[in-house]
């Protein structure tokens, strides 16, 4: 009999212990939830003020008003910014796009200088000195492929006849070439051929010759400046000049 009573009492005591443990766990969990929901409050007596960012439920010391910025619970959504990765990626893409556009528009492109021929030739004869004076207006075509204005800072030209320099022309601050455009630049050189080339005078004044063509060689150099860079283009061209037409005698 005694053994049967003790065996029956043992399961009931175990069951009661399990129920007590379960009730204890539930009580601890309820206490933790209550603490988590309870707002932060600093009880410092009269030396405290209401924390505005805590919706009036928390307090901070008066002397730390300028030091403490905010008291935000861990569950506040402000601590979990939305779409942060998307915003960062978008910012990076925008920066790359802006950098690419800046490089594309500011990257120096070529400025092409081409010869556009001789427009006007005025011939003057000096019979006394057997001298031929050629006043030649030549034209250059300058093409600007950049997205900004370029400046033609200087232009120099030499006219040669039979490998001898007979004229030199130099000028500065020539012209400004607008973006993505081309412009014609005219310059005038004066060549005098006499002395060892006095035979040119007789050749150009012989009436029996219908066409009085002579060949001159022109070496032209152009300096161009843009966004802190300086480039130089050179041209070497040969031209036929009729020294018998459009002439005057002095």
UniProtKB/Swiss-Prot annotation:
Its membrane topology: Multi-pass membrane protein; Lipid-anchor
Keyword hit for Endoplasmic reticulum: yes
Keywords: Endoplasmic reticulum, Glycoprotein, Lipoprotein, Membrane, Myristate, Transmembrane, Transmembrane helix
Pfam name, any one: TMEM106
Paired cysteines (S-S): none
UniProt KW Transmembrane keyword: yes
Gene Ontology terms: cellular component: endoplasmic reticulum membrane
Region (Disordered): 1-25
Transmembrane regions: 87-107, 197-217
Biased composition (Basic and acidic residues): 16-25
Coiled-coil segments on the chain, per record: none
InterPro entries: TMEM106 (IPR009790), TMEM106_C (IPR048509), TMEM106_N (IPR048511)
Subcellular location: Endoplasmic reticulum membrane; Membrane
Glycan-bearing residues: 173, 186
Covalent lipid sites (N-myristoyl glycine): 2
Complex and partners: Interacts with TMEM106B.
Family recorded in the similarity comment: Belongs to the TMEM106 family.
Protein name (record): Transmembrane protein 106C
Annotated organism of origin: Homo sapiens (Human)
């Amino acid at each position: 009999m005694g053994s049967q009573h003790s065996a029956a009492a043992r399961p009931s005591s175990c069951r009661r212990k399990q129920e007590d443990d379960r009730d204890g766990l539930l009580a601890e969990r309820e206490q933790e939830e209550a603490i988590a929901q309870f707002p932060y409050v600093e009880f410092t007596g009269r030396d405290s003020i209401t924390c505005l960012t805590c919706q009036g439920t928390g307090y901070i010391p008066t002397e730390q008003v300028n030091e403490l910025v905010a008291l935000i619970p861990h569950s506040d959504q402000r601590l979990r910014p939305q779409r942060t990765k998307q915003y960062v990626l978008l910012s990076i893409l925008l920066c790359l796009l802006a950098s690419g556009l800046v490089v594309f528009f500011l990257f120096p492109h070529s400025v092409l200088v081409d010869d556009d021929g001789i427009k006007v030739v005025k011939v003057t004869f000096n019979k006394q000195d057997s001298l031929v004076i050629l006043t030649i207006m030549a034209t250059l075509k300058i093409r600007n492929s950049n997205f900004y204005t370029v400046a033609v800072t200087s232009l120099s030209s030499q006219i040669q006849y039979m490998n001898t320099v007979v004229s030199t022309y130099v000028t500065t601050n020539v012209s400004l070439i607008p973006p993505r455009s081309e412009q014609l630049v005219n310059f005038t050189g004066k060549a005098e051929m006499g002395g060892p080339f006095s035979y040119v005078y007789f050749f150009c004044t012989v009436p029996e010759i219908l066409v009085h063509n002579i060949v001159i060689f022109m070496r032209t150099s152009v300096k161009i400046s843009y966004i802190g860079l300086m480039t130089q283009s050179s041209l070497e061209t040969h031209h036929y000049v009729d020294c018998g037409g459009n002439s005057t005698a002095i």
